[in-house]
Amino acid sequence: MSQGRSRGKAKGVEEFRPYVTRALPVGARVTCADNSGAKVLEIIMVQKAKTRVSRLPAAAVGDYVNVVVKKGPAELRKQVHGAVIIRQKYPVRRLNGVRVAFEDNAAVLTTPEGEMKGTDIKGPVAAEASEKWPRLANLASMVV
């Protein structure tokens, strides 16, 4: 019979992740910061979002979301894609007390495994997103 133990990690020990305010609700439009061809994305679903009844799920930096391309080439429009949020306007408080806010809300198109559909990221990437998605950090020109 099973002992109820988890494999790999010690029981009760989990990786610490600081809280990031969720500032991008479902329906928010964000700019696409990669070279896939898409210009504007609309968030239609936040993966693994736990929320209250009747409250819109919202995303923060580093979250994986389902999006629809609103402006871009015809082959990308009218279908659901995955994306990772890399910047948000609302300030993110770091553990050292610094608050970081960006000029725009931005995301990059990705697969569920974390592989980017484009080959380049325009602008900076938040450190919270690069820690959670290491493949994005490899392509980022600047991590803030």
UniProtKB/Swiss-Prot annotation:
Source taxon at top rank: Archaea
InterPro entries the record matches: Ribosomal_uL14, Ribosomal_uL14_CS, Ribosomal_uL14_sf
Gene Ontology MF term list: large ribosomal subunit rRNA binding; structural constituent of ribosome
CDD domains in the record: Ribosomal_uL14
Residues passing through the membrane, by range: none
A Pfam family assignment: Ribosomal_L14
GO CC annotations on file: cytosolic large ribosomal subunit
Keywords tagged on the record: Ribonucleoprotein, Ribosomal protein, RNA-binding, rRNA-binding
Coiled coil region boundaries: none
Gene Ontology biological process terms, A to Z: translation
HAMAP family, per the entry: Ribosomal_uL14
Described purpose of this protein according to its UniProt entry: Binds to 23S rRNA. Forms part of two intersubunit bridges in the 70S ribosome.
Membership in a protein family: Belongs to the universal ribosomal protein uL14 family.
Protein name as catalogued: Large ribosomal subunit protein uL14
Organism, scientific name: Cenarchaeum symbiosum (strain A)
Lineage: Archaea, Nitrososphaerota, Candidatus Cenarchaeales, Candidatus Cenarchaeaceae, Candidatus Cenarchaeum
Gene: rpl14
